[in-house]
Amino acid sequence: ATQVPHYLQKYLSKVLEIPLHKIRVIKPVVGGGFGGKSDPFPHEIITSYLSIKTHRPVKCVFTREEVFISNHGRHPTKMTLSVGADKQGKITGLDTDIVIDGGSYGSFGVVTSYYNGVLLQGPYRINEFGFTTTRTYTNKPQCGAMRGHGAVNPRYAMEVIIDELSHSLKMDPCDFREKNFLPANTLTVGQLRITSNGVLDCLKAVRE
């Protein structure tokens, strides 16, 4: 299955040199994607080519190990984050500089860089936000949309900093988080609409 039928159609047309209107990509029901179905992959093009050459349907089946080998991994990330807070424990601002290693091809590098900045603006209220990002090319396998791309790495860094900041203010880290959570139906500083924020309920349940 694929999550990007039109994207795949475009690349099949380009690589196989077939007019776009003569290519039809049928997307069956997709189960879990987790980033492994959001890029055109070599095996999709190879099976199409083999089908043309043999004039027969061609099916490609991977073992679980082969799935992990063929999929694109998570971007190694170098992050520099600075968070400010007042004496009452209210976050006053966040400044970030993030460099991601995307490997030898573009894939989802631009999107991952974008998500790094957008998703750092929640789930806390941040009124002042600075963000710079760089996606680098290196002589490594390409990286892609691996499970929560653009969210997991900077979120880890942010939560570590919040713990450190809480301790420096002699505040309980849970109290600090509760004080700064964005309520439902609000906008982040970058105008991302937050319709719900269940993290606060999760935190309360853990404390109880």
Per-segment meaning from a language model:
Residues A1-E208:
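Structural alpha/beta core scaffold segments of enzyme domains
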